[in-house]
UniProtKB/Swiss-Prot annotation:
BP-aspect Gene Ontology terms: cell wall organization; peptidoglycan biosynthetic process; regulation of cell shape
EC number: 5.1.1.3
Protein's name in the database: Glutamate racemase
Species this chain originates from: Actinobacillus pleuropneumoniae serotype 3 (strain JL03)
One Pfam family matching this protein: Asp_Glu_race
A GO MF term: glutamate racemase activity
Gene coding for it: murI
Amino acid sequence: MKPTILLYDSGMGGLTIYDAIRQTLPNAHYLYCFDNAYFPYSERSENVLIEQAVKIVQKIAEKYPLDMVVVACNTASTVVLPALREKFAFPIVGTVPAIKPAAAISQTKTIGLLATKGTVERPYVAELIEKYAKDCIVEKIGTTTLVELVEEKIRTGQVDQERLIEVIAEWQTHPTLDTVILGCTHFPLVKQELQQLLPNVKYFIDPGNGIANRVSALLSESVPEEPEQNKENIAFCTKIDEEFFKREVIMQQWGFKRLELLNFL
């Protein structure tokens, strides 16, 4: 059996998680949903995030027997995991800011959490800091702008350098910051740009590999002897807009056969 893994995010940032999992489990069957009707999640209420999570997983599970769901979004993961685990029997894996490894690796005990406003403000994140980084100074930047810049980079290949500098300017002169947590699945896609703008930061912590290892541990993958039918990797969106065909090309470049509208009617 090829395990079927659904990943979802409000945008295409969750592709960084998909890419890490695919490198570990290249023969799995992948479904990816970006909930562009509600992008960005950082601007949505907790109730809306929970409602959307359940609707998306339920709708896709009706057509595809799922073996696992990966919530490839930090903002959603800080809210929706209990509701999903209560409703569905298959494993649900979340994406939360890598506070613990960052605190362990930082030599100056000064770490930066770069995430969305929603993630930075969640009580769950405060609990992680209290539990794993009590001996650290944790500087936080909550930004929706950077999410938008990454989506733009995915579509055009270009990053607006001036807007990027505006987002992280306060860290450029920080005397002791040596570790930055990429606390949104979009942000590894601008890791190179961040490294250039923050040369004093030694470590950029990306959660992708840790999640891939967790998924791999939960799934026992077996490669079928014969190719299985109806196991194409498919991407879904929740709204058709002027970017639809451009996004379909992008998703095909990431290994998805086609992009479909997820219709809740």
